[in-house]
């Protein structure tokens, strides 16, 4: 029977069961791309279905207890207890029904670029790279370095990563659900290894993140005529050759000017496929940003330049202090954060975002 108070939950339950039926069909089960898309939606609806099932259970038990209360005093006590539980179950369901970012369950492409500060900025970009790789390791995610330019001192001029979860995670456990808040300028304050007089220097690195598109994502179509593809020899740290074939690919999307370099894979064909997937991810992110702008509901803005004034977070080494300027989160465990203990910082952004979404629903 339909629930007049929560019709959206009933619709979600119906879709949830419909998806389960589709996933059981042999032709769907043998199609990994189709299964991934259905699995992602199934996981997204799962939170609603779980909250709705719990709410219905409390509500039905309460109605039954009230009917039996006139015959058995014990049921009157049970009804009183359930009356106390019902508001919390309702609130949990209302929260679950608040629309999530549809990309939360997606994997993520991340770019880290050294900004103002010369060699020190490149060294800090390397610190951020290690921090995110350690964080991904703690979360059980895989990290693929798709392209990287380093300095002689071991710093990072720029690096591109693909960070992916195992299987099909629930939206709240997706890579994008956590890492989407990392986009912006990260500022560091410390005494550089190149500083002979021991003065504290401020420099910065920029982080750009966007959800990774599926290989068969039909939301973005790219005309081959709009692509300019250059082939070159892969190179490693210090300009060393990775292999002796021209397998690296530079793919340019002519209408937007977006350029993707890919040399991580072993063959030119693999690098072309990987570059095309990253390009689709960037175009998908651009499309979603435009849609959000039109709806006056922009996502957390990311770095548009590497100016220190656009900082989202400051890493102060002398004080072992980290500050997130969007949420006013502050802690004195910078060493642990740079070793991948980033969850508390990210949680502060998630909680602020959820509070905003709740406020917009009221």
From Swiss-Prot:
Mind telling me which GO cellular component terms the entry cites? Answer: cytoplasm
**Molecular-function GO term, any one:** translation release factor activity, codon specific
Could you state what the record's PTM comment says about this protein? Answer: Methylated by PrmC. Methylation increases the termination efficiency of RF1.
- Primary residence: cytoplasm
- Domain of life, per the record? Bacteria
The record's section on InterPro entries has: PCRF (IPR005139), Pep_chain_release_fac_I (IPR000352), Pep_chain_release_fac_I_sf (IPR045853), Prokaryotic/Mito_RF (IPR050057), RF-1 (IPR004373)
Alphabetically sorted, this entry's keywords are: Cytoplasm, Methylation, Protein biosynthesis
> Where, per the database record, does this protein carry N5-methylglutamine?
240
Which cystines does this chain contain?
A: none
Q: Where in the cell is it found?
A: Cytoplasm
Q: Name one Pfam family in it.
A: RF-1
Instruction: Explain the purpose of this protein.
Output: Peptide chain release factor 1 directs the termination of translation in response to the peptide chain termination codons UAG and UAA.
Q: Which family does it belong to?
A: Belongs to the prokaryotic/mitochondrial release factor family.
HAMAP family (UniProt xref): Rel_fac_1 (MF_00093)
State the NCBIfam families in the record: prfA (TIGR00019), PRK00591.1 (NF001859)
Supply the name of the protein. Answer: Peptide chain release factor 1
Organism source for this protein? Answer: Bifidobacterium adolescentis (strain ATCC 15703 / DSM 20083 / NCTC 11814 / E194a)
């Amino acid at each position: 029977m339909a629930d007049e108070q929560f019709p959206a939950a009933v619709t979600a339950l119906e879709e949830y069961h419909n998806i389960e039926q589709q996933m059981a069909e042999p032709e769907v089960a043998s199609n990994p791309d189709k299964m991934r898309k259905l699995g992602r939606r199934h996981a997204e609806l799962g939170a609603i279905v779980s909250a709705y099932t719990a709410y219905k259970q409390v509500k039905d038990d309460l109605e039954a207890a009230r009917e039996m209360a006139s015959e058995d005093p014990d049921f009157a006590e049970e009804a009183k207890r359930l009356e106390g539980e019902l508001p919390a179950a309702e609130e949990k369901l209302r929260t679950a029904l608040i629309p999530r970012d549809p990309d939360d369950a997606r994997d993520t492409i991340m770019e880290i670029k050294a900004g103002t500060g010369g060699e020190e900025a490149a060294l800090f970009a390397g610190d951020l790279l290690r921090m995110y790789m350690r964080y991904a390791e703690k979360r059980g995610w895989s990290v693929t370095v798709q392209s990287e330019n380093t300095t002689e001192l071991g710093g990072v001029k720029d690096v591109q990563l693909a960070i992916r979860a195992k299987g099909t995670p629930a939206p709240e456990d997706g890579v994008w659900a956590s890492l989407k808040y990392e986009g912006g300028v990260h500022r560091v304050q410390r005494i550089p290894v190149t500083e002979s007089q021991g003065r504290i220097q401020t420099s910065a690195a920029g982080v750009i993140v966007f959800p990774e598109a599926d290989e068969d994502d039909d939301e973005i179509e790219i005309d081959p005529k709009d692509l300019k593809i250059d082939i070159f020899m892969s190179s490693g740290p210090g300009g060393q050759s990775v292999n002796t074939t021209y397998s690296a690919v530079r793919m340019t999307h002519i209408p937007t000017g977006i350029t993707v370099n890919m040399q991580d894979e072993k063959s030119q064909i693999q690098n072309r496929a990987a570059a095309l997937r990253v390009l689709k991810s960037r175009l998908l992110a651009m499309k979603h940003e435009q849609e959000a702008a039109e709806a006056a509901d922009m996502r957390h803005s990311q770095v548009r330049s590497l100016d220190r004034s656009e900082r989202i977070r400051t890493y102060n080494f002398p004080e072992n202090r980290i500050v997130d300027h969007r949420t006013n989160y502050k802690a004195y465990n910078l060493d642990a954060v740079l070793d991948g203990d980033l969850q508390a910082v990210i949680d502060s952004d998630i909680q602020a975002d959820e509070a905003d979404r709740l406020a917009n629903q009221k």
